[in-house]
C-alpha cells in the first residue's frame, strides 16, 4: 500500500502566468476586432480562447507528491502522472538541453529538477523547495531499495 511521504507545490513566477495567458489574450483581442465583420467568427474565436485556456489549466501541475514507491505529479481534476521508483535512475539539476517531459512552472532553472528514467523520457519539474524535495526523495528511494532487497 502506498503512503505519502512528502508533498510540494510548483514554484511559479509571473512570467509563466503571462506566457500561459498570452495565446488566449491574443485570440480575444482579435475576436474583439472582428465582431463587427462576422459574429460567427468572433464566437468561434471566443470558444477557441476558452478551450485553449482550459487545456493549459489542465496541463500545469498543481502538486508534486513523493510516496513510498513512486513520485506522483498531480494536475487539476482526476489527472495525475506516476513515476515508479523502478524506472528512476537519478534525480538532480537538469542538463542544459533535455528531451523529455517538461512541466516547468517558472522561467528560472534554479528550482528545476530532472528525473532521469530507465528506457523512458526524463521528466523536468519545478518544486517550490528543491532541496527538501530531493532529500525526501533520496530518503524514500533508499527505504524503497532496502524493502525491495528483503
Locations of regions flagged by a protein language model:
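N-terminal membrane-targeting/pre-transmembrane regions
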Residues: 1-36, 105, 110-120, 133
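A short, polar/proline- and glycine-enriched secondary-structure boundary/capping micro-motif
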Residues: 17, 84-85, 134-138
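Short, intrinsically disordered/low-complexity patches at protein termini
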Residues: 29-30, 40, 96-97, 105-108, ...
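Hydrophobic alpha-helical transmembrane segments
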Residues: 37-49
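Conserved beta-hairpin
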Residues: 48-85, 90
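Non-transmembrane, membrane-adjacent beta-strand/coil modules in membrane-associated proteins
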Residues: 74-132
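Charged phosphate-binding loop/patch that engages nucleotide di/tri-phosphates or the phosphate backbone
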Residues: 136-150
Amino acid at each position: 500500500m502506498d503512503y505519502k511521504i512528502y508533498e510540494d507545490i510548483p514554484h511559479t513566477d509571473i512570467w509563466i502566468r503571462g506566457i500561459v495567458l498570452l495565446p488566449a489574450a491574443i485570440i480575444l483581442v482579435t475576436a474583439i476586432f472582428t465582431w463587427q465583420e462576422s459574429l460567427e467568427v468572433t464566437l468561434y474565436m471566443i470558444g477557441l480562447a476558452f478551450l485553449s485556456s482550459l487545456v493549459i489549466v489542465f496541463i500545469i501541475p498543481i502538486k508534486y507528491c513523493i510516496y513510498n514507491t513512486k513520485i506522483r505529479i498531480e494536475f487539476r481534476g482526476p489527472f495525475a502522472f506516476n513515476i515508479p521508483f523502478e524506472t528512476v535512475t537519478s534525480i538532480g539539476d537538469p542538463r542544459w538541453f533535455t528531451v523529455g517531459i517538461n512541466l516547468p512552472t517558472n522561467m528560472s532553472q534554479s528550482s528545476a529538477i530532472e528525473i532521469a528514467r530507465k528506457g523512458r523520457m526524463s521528466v523536468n519539474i519545478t518544486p517550490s523547495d528543491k532541496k527538501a524535495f530531493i532529500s525526501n526523495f533520496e530518503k524514500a528511494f533508499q527505504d524503497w531499495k532496502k524493502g525491495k532487497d528483503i
